[in-house]
Amino acid sequence: MAGTNPRAARIAALIQRVIASSMEAQLHDKRLANVTITEVRVTNDLQIAKVYWTQLGHEGHEQGERRRAQQALNQAKGRLRSLVGTKAGLRLTPQLEFIFDEVPGEAHEIEDILALAHKRDEELAKSRANAQYAGDADPYKHDEPDDDDFDDDDDVEVEDWDDDDEA
């Protein structure tokens, strides 16, 4: 792809500019009104250009609008390729493949999830502000000697065990 070949990267940037400006100026298709070209990747042999696009759509109508925009891009593919060839001055103009870019939509979903997590963290911090620990201040049990079992005054007999007695 364009990352390994500097010439392919330059041509990809040129194709992106040409297609984006041509969609506004020369293609007067209402289906392409909210279409944005996000990235173009060109193979190292300059034969294929993958054009990634996204669409700012209305909630609920995105699938239908996306399908109509894809049809409009496919119908305009020949004209756009011709414009790219004219502006780029290449011997062979790359074949254009239009691919819907899922990344902006997924990024928006991730941002929503992170915002929800941040909101829950704030709520948890508020509930912890006035919280108190349950139970005693010192939750560990300590062994206290009972006075009834053993007194210091009691004499304790200790038997001596010799190894000779056992044999």
UniProtKB/Swiss-Prot annotation:
Stretch list, region Disordered: 127-167
UniProt subcellular location: Cytoplasm
Example GO BP: maturation of SSU-rRNA
InterPro entries assigned to the protein according to its UniProt record, in alphabetical order: KH_dom-like_a/b, RbfA, RbfA_dom_sf, Ribosome-bd_factorA_CS
PROSITE patterns found in the cross-reference section: RBFA
The organism's place on the tree of life at top rank: Bacteria
Main localization category: cytoplasm
Pfam families: RBFA
Compositional bias annotation for Acidic residues: 145-167
GO cellular component: cytosol
Keyword Cytoplasm (UniProt): yes
Described function: One of several proteins that assist in the late maturation steps of the functional core of the 30S ribosomal subunit. Associates with free 30S ribosomal subunits (but not with 30S subunits that are part of 70S ribosomes or polysomes). Required for efficient processing of 16S rRNA. May interact with the 5'-terminal helix region of 16S rRNA.
Subunit structure: Monomer. Binds 30S ribosomal subunits, but not 50S ribosomal subunits or 70S ribosomes.
Protein name (record): Ribosome-binding factor A
